Amino acid sequence: MGKKSAEKTELVIVTGLSGAGKSRAVDALEDIGFFCVDNMPPKLIPTFVKLIFNSNEKRDRVAIVADIRLGDSFSDIFGVLDELKEDEINYKILFIDADNDVIMRRYQETRRKHPLADEFNTPSILEAIQKEREILLPARLQADYIVDTSNVTSSQFKERIAKLFLDNASSSLKIYSISFGFK
């Protein structure tokens, strides 16, 4: 793989608790120019990254979401991260977290089922959240950034993500004006 491509591309692995705000994080990353892929099986990440690096299309910023929805294959993420390090591919891990009460409230508001509810026969959302915390603990410990969404608004969360991943040079306001005439 071309080392220059790997050095130029910013790779972010997004993970965290279900209901904590990973989808909003992806939206925020897309808004600041990231190419985002959600729910990618970890074993596909090295191949995908190599394709991105060797592509003719310019992809300077890539974010990949890998989380518990992948079931047992999520545990492959740690071997994959080691493989990326061996290939000298730099990446950052963004872990999205929230308090149990906040996540429970979000699930009750959306009336969605927690991804682990069926897998572990947990009738309680709280039990599913606690089990997910156990499973994700190694990822949280390796995270470069941990963002807690418990007490922030959507716009504050988006701002935090932007501050983490925008450098001073690119944080200035850019205005593009495009016009055309038709006769």
Residue spans for each PLM region:
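The conserved Walker
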Residues: 18
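Conserved glycine(s) of the Walker
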Residues: 21
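Post-Walker A alpha-helix
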Residues: 25-26
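Switch/connector loops and helix/strand junctions flanking conserved nucleotide-binding motifs
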Residues: 72-74, 100-107, 116, 155-156
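Conserved nucleotide-sensing/catalytic segment adjacent to the nucleotide-binding pocket
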Residues: 32, 36-83
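Hydrophobic anchor at the beta1->P-loop junction of P-loop NTPases
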Residues: 14
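Conserved phosphate-donor/acceptor-positioning beta-strand/loop module used by diverse small-molecule
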Residues: 87-111, 147-148
